[in-house]
Regions:
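Short alpha-helical patches at coil-to-helix transitions and adjacent helical residues
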Residues: 34-39, 116-120
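Active-site-proximal loop and beta-strand segments within enzyme catalytic domains
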Residues: 1-36, 43-44, 50-56, 60, ...
Length: 456
């Protein structure tokens, strides 16, 4: 569920509260799954126990003892350094600059920015049993648990090409494997424009850090393995050639393959509604708000950091393709589907954010229309339906309320001309009927029908 946090401008606690609304793709401990939210949980847990921000705890317990002075926790601070690195990405045969991605809200999952020299201090502490110059930095009891296998990541079987690289398990935040007969502990990661890997061999007291300023780069693992072969005096594998051959094979297999988007598209269809009907805010408690705007008769999608040049292209019926900036034409695009209720109104949209899960459904929010108290006063009074008297009144300055006997008072949200949504009842609407500029009745629009109440 990385799209929930990626580029989200919310607090750390807000992200934490989203977790309960995110559908799991497997039961607890059924299979191994990497989840950035769980690293966030650990960071927040430490904050609650110690009563200090995660950043302060890392400084006190790790940076200061190791003499790490230049590392920071935000790309905002990174850019204040005299020699900060720029991130890049590759598309086809071109290299282009990527803007920094601020991930402060989910910081414990990977917001630390550090040099190779300072990261090497961290790697060497682990390579030396958790000690620095004989002083214990990482408690021995935790050290052993952290580099002990707790769950299989995958089969990790020896392959024909590299039979001496096998096993794949997870410790406490560390991936464990056997590299040519040596016990390897490693963790890598990627964020916009940057790739990294930290590894160490506890039996050999060797630590290796590789940092690359390119997006999703395979160079980190290639360089790590090449250094390992030399430092541990192992037979040298041409890891660069292996990776290049794999890339060429993938390009060969994909050459001439028809884009899946064109294969699945139903031609000759049209959207069911005018463009303006799709505009609005759509909300999911685990993902937040997606905003759809109409820019010169083209729908634009705004979500978290996706704010510019993300447009919706009609695919078929009420399904649209999401077109991202700098996205290659051959890439299969994400789809969003707009949904309507029984009244024929667009009231939701869904998106396949996770391939192994159901599409995420975002409910369309009511857009409140500014209405003065004077305008609201014309709707107040008593209405009758089937012998029942319903009261409409104003609460506070300009909040219209409706009271049905035996039910709680309902707040109404003005959404159109003489039209109100129930704030707490999905699918319920009130529409006032006027004759000669005077309210004569109101229609209750409910999922099971429309009911008229005449004004007394």
């Amino acid at each position: 569920h990385d799209l929930s946090w990626y580029g989200a401008e919310v607090s750390r606690d807000s992200l934490l509260r989203r977790i309960k609304y995110l559908q799991p793709s497997a039961g607890l401990r059924e299979v191994y799954q990497y989840n950035n939210f769980m690293f966030l949980v650990q960071g927040i847990l430490a904050e609650k126990i110690e009563g200090k921000p995660w950043e302060v705890l890392v400084k006190e317990k790790i940076f200061n003892p190791l003499g790490i002075t230049n590392a920071n926790f935000s790309v905002n601070d990174l850019q204040k350094a005299p020699d900060f690195s720029l991130g890049y990405a590759k598309m086809k045969d071109s290299i282009f600059r990527l803007p920094y991605m601020n991930i402060d809200p989910i910081g414990p999952a990977g917001s630390i920015n550090a040099s190779a020299a300072e990261m090497a201090k961290w790697a060497m502490v682990w390579a030396n049993g958790g000690k620095l110059n004989g002083k214990e930095i990482i408690p021995a009891s935790f050290y052993n648990k952290a580099i002990t296998s707790h769950m299989a990541v995958n089969a990790g079987l020896p392959g024909k090409q590299n039979p001496d690289v096998h096993l794949s398990t997870i410790g406490l935040g560390w991936f464990l494997s056997s590299y040519k007969g040596h016990y390897r502990v490693e963790h890598g990661g990627n964020i916009d424009g940057f790739s990294a890997t930290v590894s160490f061999f506890p039996s050999d007291t060797v630590g290796i850090v590789v940092l690359v300023n390119q997006n999703g780069s395979s160079a980190t693992s290639i360089i790590r393995n090449m250094i390992t072969d030399r430092v541990l005096k192992l037979h040298r594998t041409d890891w660069n050639k292996i990776q290049l051959d794999a890339i060429k094979e993938a390009e060969k297999n994909s050459a001439g393959v028809t884009n899946p988007d064109s294969l699945g598209r139903k031609t000759g269809t049209q959207p069911s509604h005018p463009i303006a009907d799709y505009v609005g805010e759509y909300f999911h408690p685990g993902y937040g708000v997606i905003k759809i705007e109409n820019i010169r008769d083209t729908l634009r999608l705004i979500y978290n950091s996706f704010r510019e040049n993300v447009y919706l292209t009609h695919y078929h019926y009420d399904v649209f393709s999401v077109t991202l900036p700098d996205q290659e034409e051959s890439t299969q695009k994400m789809k969003v589907q707009f949904l309507m209720n029984t009244r024929g109104e667009i009231d939701a949209m869904s998106a396949q954010f996770e391939a192994a899960l159901d599409p995420v459904k975002f409910e369309k929010r009511s857009v409140e229309k500014p209405v003065t108290k004077q305008e609201l006063e014309r709707y107040t009074g008593e209405y009758e339906i089937s012998g029942i008297t319903i009261k409409v009144y104003i609460k506070g300055e300009n909040t219209l309320m409706v009271l049905v006997p035996g039910q709680p008072d309902y707040e109404l949200i003005p959404v159109g001309e003489h039209e109100f949504d129930f704030k707490t009842l999905k699918g319920f609407k009130l529409k006032f009927v006027l004759e000669k500029d005077k309210v004569t009745s109101m229609d209750f629009h409910q999922p099971n029908g429309v009911f008229k109440a005449n004004k007394k």
